[in-house]
């Protein structure tokens, strides 16, 4: 990957945008019986959440193959959070129309029971009915019906898992969201979009030149990214539904590190048009001239908006080594946020604005760290030697990042408290640049 000046790396500041080309978590893959295995994945999970909810998830009645596949996706979704303990529901015979024996399930150790049915109509569409029971309170927590085609069944399973997760934890689930990443195979780069568990990958863009720094628009309809196909780094915005793309930052020098404003109307970018890399604001449709935000004697790069849209968090070496700063959209003095260690890069802010995520060099290793902004407490979430490219889930409960194990690039995930970790290795190609999409419903 070409060296770009507006970024940081271990060897020198001028190499750092190459750190964008690392791996992403396809957050855990479980294949459905009705879907071919288009990716070869190995998943390992370690750790559990501070609280584990015991739940039985029965195969959906009415169609043995599809009913079992639906339940397997739901089980896999909930299992990888580390917050649920599965109770065996084999042979339960539960249907949505039969009464549930709360005491029996409670005796088996299940506080919650999820079950349902699936049937196919004359038009070929499937009706899926689902129920969630609380065996402690002896009532039904949730119940809803879905209708969809065969290719939509997996997404419906994710939606059911989202409902279960939210009803029990009070936090919105992210199983039906999407991720984007760059797949490098040989001399070809592909910008791909997939389900949060890595299934159903779709190619949004293919190029012989590098593609880096993909980032989702707030409504999930577009991706901004950096492409080198014109011979230098240029920031583009692509509409996923039409694949139409427009350049939004194509100025003198390097154009890099796009980040969407919360309202989707603007992008923060790093430009070298006036010399060293500095932070600018450009319009998301490419219609306005760039507005400069930072003016420092050092290199400023890797911007990200705060959730309220009033300020930008970015990486700068103005203090000597790369650290993370915050500045208002009106410019002015920047406030330093990180003080532990001499090297902190790649900032990401949690959806509620309370936690900063970044790559920290500690004891010669590069790890994903989180900083509680109100208290100033730093927590190292990972323990690898080369962990990079963190990205928050839209509910703030999980983090995607890139790791290296046994000399190979793998995708990894960690819960926001560091208790539950996952690794996922891909056999073919290199998967880079994790970015988790927003809620879209």
UniProtKB/Swiss-Prot annotation:
<feature type="signal peptide">
    <location>
        <begin position="1"/>
        <end position="39"/>
    </location>
</feature>
<keyword id="KW-0131">Cell cycle</keyword>
<comment type="function">
    <text>Part of the Tol-Pal system, which plays a role in outer membrane invagination during cell division and is important for maintaining outer membrane integrity.</text>
</comment>
<dbReference type="InterPro" id="IPR011042">
    <property type="entry name" value="6-blade_b-propeller_TolB-like"/>
</dbReference>
<dbReference type="Pfam" id="PF07676">
    <property type="entry name" value="PD40"/>
</dbReference>
<dbReference type="InterPro" id="IPR007195">
    <property type="entry name" value="TolB_N"/>
</dbReference>
<protein>
    <recommendedName>
        <fullName>Tol-Pal system protein TolB</fullName>
    </recommendedName>
</protein>
<dbReference type="Pfam" id="PF04052">
    <property type="entry name" value="TolB_N"/>
</dbReference>
<dbReference type="GO" id="GO:0042597">
    <property type="term" value="C:periplasmic space"/>
</dbReference>
<comment type="subunit">
    <text>The Tol-Pal system is composed of five core proteins: the inner membrane proteins TolA, TolQ and TolR, the periplasmic protein TolB and the outer membrane protein Pal. They form a network linking the inner and outer membranes and the peptidoglycan layer.</text>
</comment>
<dbReference type="InterPro" id="IPR014167">
    <property type="entry name" value="Tol-Pal_TolB"/>
</dbReference>
<dbReference type="GO" id="GO:0017038">
    <property type="term" value="P:protein import"/>
</dbReference>
<keyword id="KW-0574">Periplasm</keyword>
<comment type="similarity">
    <text>Belongs to the TolB family.</text>
</comment>
<dbReference type="GO" id="GO:0051301">
    <property type="term" value="P:cell division"/>
</dbReference>
<keyword id="KW-0132">Cell division</keyword>
<dbReference type="InterPro" id="IPR011659">
    <property type="entry name" value="PD40"/>
</dbReference>
<keyword id="KW-0732">Signal</keyword>
């Amino acid at each position: 990957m070409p060296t770009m000046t507006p970024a940081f790396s271990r060897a020198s500041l001028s190499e750092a945008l190459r750190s964008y080309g690392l791996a992403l978590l396809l957050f855990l893959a479980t294949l459905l019986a009705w879907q071919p295995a288009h990716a070869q994945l190995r998943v390992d999970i370690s750790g559990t959440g501070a609280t584990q909810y015991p739940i039985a998830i029965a195969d959906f009645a009415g169609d043995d193959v599809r009913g079992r596949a639906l339940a397997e996706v739901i089980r896999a979704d909930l299992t990888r959070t580390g917050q649920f303990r599965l109770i065996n529901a084999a042979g339960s015979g539960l249907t949505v129309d039969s009464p549930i024996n709360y005491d029996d399930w409670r005796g088996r150790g299940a506080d919650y029971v999820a079950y349902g049915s699936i049937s196919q109509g004359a038009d070929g569409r499937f009706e899926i009915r689902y129920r969630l029971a609380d065996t402690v309170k002896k009532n039904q927590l949730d119940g809803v019906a879905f209708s969809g085609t065969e290719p939509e069944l997996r997404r419906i399973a994710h939606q059911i898992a989202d409902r279960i997760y939210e009803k029990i934890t009070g936090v919105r689930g992210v199983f039906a969201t999407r991720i984007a990443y760059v797949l490098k195979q040989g001399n070809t780069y592909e910008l791909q979009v997939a389900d949060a568990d890595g299934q159903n990958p779709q190619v949004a863009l293919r190029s012989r030149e590098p593609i880096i720094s993909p980032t989702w628009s707030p409504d999930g309809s577009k991706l901004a990214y950096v492409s080198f196909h014109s011979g230098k780094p240029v920031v583009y915005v692509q509409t996923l539904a039409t694949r139409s793309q427009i350049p939004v930052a194509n100025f003198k020098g390097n154009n890099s590190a796009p980040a969407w404003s919360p309202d989707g109307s603007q992008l923060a970018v790093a430009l070298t048009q006036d010399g060293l890399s500095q932070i600018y604001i450009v319009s998301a449709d490419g219609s306005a001239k760039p507005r400069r935000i930072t003016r420092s004697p050092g290199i400023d790069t890797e911007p990200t908006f705060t959730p309220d849209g009033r300020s930008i968090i970015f990486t700068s070496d103005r203090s000597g080594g790369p650290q993370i700063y915050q500045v208002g959209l009106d410019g002015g003095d920047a406030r330093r946020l990180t003080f532990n260690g001499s090297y902190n890069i790649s900032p990401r802010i949690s959806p509620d604005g309370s936690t900063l995520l970044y790559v920290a060099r500690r004891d010669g290793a590069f790890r994903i760290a989180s900083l509680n902004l109100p208290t100033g407490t730093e927590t190292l979430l990972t323990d690898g030697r080369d962990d990079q490219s963190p990205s928050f889930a839209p509910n703030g409960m999980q983090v995607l990042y890139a790791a290296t194990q046994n000399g190979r690039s793998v995708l990894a995930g960690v819960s926001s408290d560091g208790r539950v970790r996952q690794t996922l290795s891909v056999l073919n190609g290199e998967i880079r640049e994790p970015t988790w999409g927003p809620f879209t419903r």
